[in-house]
């Protein structure tokens, strides 16, 4: 294959990730390549994490993030953990600083293999999320699905974790709701001019939540790290839990919870696993790919 780059199929809590090594190149992974890769069951993904050479001093790489529909994403916590594991395997380093379009992310791999990512600061101002209407209190806005007198979902908390999130609090298992039906309607609601990630969240205890997410640009996903962060922040902000919680991602077959710590300095730190599956080469323009005959174990 001519003009190819190395990539790895990985996952973070079953959130399907392609880590593509674009270092040493000036071009980007194209939307056409993303759509082509997602059309093949072997390379189907939620996000592409494209690793580029650093653009600013003090960082290890610039990360360009694409959704499976070819659109750009501002943040992907599960994908960031995958990048950390891939680069740690390659370099032996355990601490990294990345630049994304949403800002700077710091991450560290621990001795037990778990990876912590500082996802930055949550933003609550309506214009920062953004919303199409002004709300002074974004911990509960006027928005619902279903009949006016008996809504199925209503009054979400909204915020930005580098990307827009709406958290609907529910009193039963999030898996019992038809999110595949409601997700697209809410993602594309006029309230969200840049669309939004839609999460159903249930309080299990004062230190545990259960969530399920319809991801902007990706659809019904097995896991979404930034949505877990938004859920944890919303829970603490509204007095449902403390500032450090575990998140049981209801749709993920990986039964390892995420730990989210909304620290006193306002930074949100997510800790969880990442898993390497296999490696290959791909044309970043067309999406034509081939699997390696011998696994590399690093990008």
Curated annotation (Swiss-Prot):
The family line of this record is: Belongs to the diaminopimelate epimerase family.
Catalytic reaction list: (2S,6S)-2,6-diaminopimelate = meso-2,6-diaminopimelate
GO MF terms here are: diaminopimelate epimerase activity
Q: In which pathway does it act?
A: Amino-acid biosynthesis; L-lysine biosynthesis via DAP pathway; DL-2,6-diaminopimelate from LL-2,6-diaminopimelate: step 1/1
Describe the protein's quaternary organization and the partners it interacts with. Homodimer.
State the active site: 76, 224
Q: Which positions in this protein are listed as binding substrate?
A: 15, 47, 67, 77-78, 163, 197, 215-216, 225-226
Write down the InterPro entries for this protein, in alphabetical order. DAP_epimerase_AS, DAP_epimerase_DapF
What are the EC numbers?
Answer: 5.1.1.7
Q: Does the keyword Glycosyltransferase apply?
A: no
Name of this chain's protein: Diaminopimelate epimerase
Which is a GO BP term held by this UniProt record? lysine biosynthetic process via diaminopimelate
Q: Where is this site: Could be important to modulate the pK values of the two catalytic cysteine residues?
A: 165, 215
Question: Subcellular location, in the record's words?
Answer: Cytoplasm
What keywords would UniProt list here?
A: Amino-acid biosynthesis, Cytoplasm, Isomerase, Lysine biosynthesis
The record's section on SUPFAM superfamilies has: Diaminopimelate epimerase-like
Instruction: List the lineage, top down.
Output: Bacteria, Pseudomonadati, Pseudomonadota, Alphaproteobacteria, Hyphomicrobiales
Q: Does the keyword Amino-acid biosynthesis apply?
A: yes
Which residues are in coiled coils?
A: none
Q: Where does it sit, as one GO cellular component term?
A: cytosol
EC class name? isomerase
Q: What does this protein do?
A: Catalyzes the stereoinversion of LL-2,6-diaminopimelate (L,L-DAP) to meso-diaminopimelate (meso-DAP), a precursor of L-lysine and an essential component of the bacterial peptidoglycan.
């Amino acid at each position: 294959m001519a003009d190819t780059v190395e990539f790895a199929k990985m996952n973070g809590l079953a959130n399907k990730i392609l880590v593509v090594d674009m270092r040493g190149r000036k071009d980007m992974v194209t939307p056409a390549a993303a759509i082509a890769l997602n059309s093949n069951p072997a390379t189907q993904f939620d996000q592409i994490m494209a690793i580029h050479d650093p653009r600013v001093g003090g960082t290890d790489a610039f990360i360009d993030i694409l959704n499976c529909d070819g659109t750009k994403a501002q943040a992907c916590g599960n994908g960031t953990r995958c990048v950390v594991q891939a680069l740690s395997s390659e370099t032996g380093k355990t601490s990294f600083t990345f630049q994304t379009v949403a800002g700077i992310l710091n991450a560290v791999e621990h001795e037990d293999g778990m990876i912590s990512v500082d996802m930055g600061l949550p933003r609550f101002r309506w214009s920062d999320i953004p919303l199409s209407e002004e709300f002074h209190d974004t911990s509960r806005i006027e928005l619902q699905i279903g009949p006016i007198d008996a809504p199925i979902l209503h009054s979400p908390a909204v915020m930005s974790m580098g990307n827009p999130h709406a958290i609907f609090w529910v009193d039963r298992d999030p898996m019992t709701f038809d999110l595949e039906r409601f997700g697209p309607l809410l993602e594309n609601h006029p309230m969200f001019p840049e669309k939004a990630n839609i999460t159903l969240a249930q309080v299990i205890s004062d230190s545990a939540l259960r969530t399920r997410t319809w991801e902007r640009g990706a659809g019904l996903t097995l896991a979404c790290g930034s949505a877990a962060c938004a859920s944890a922040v919303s829970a603490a902000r509204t007095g449902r839990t403390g500032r450090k919680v575990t998140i049981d991602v209801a749709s993920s077959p990986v039964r390892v919870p995420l730990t989210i710590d909304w620290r006193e300095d306002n930074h949100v730190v997510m800790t969880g696993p990442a898993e390497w599956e296999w490696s290959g080469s791909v044309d970043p323009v067309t999406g034509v790919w081939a699997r390696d005959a011998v696994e590399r174990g690093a990008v």
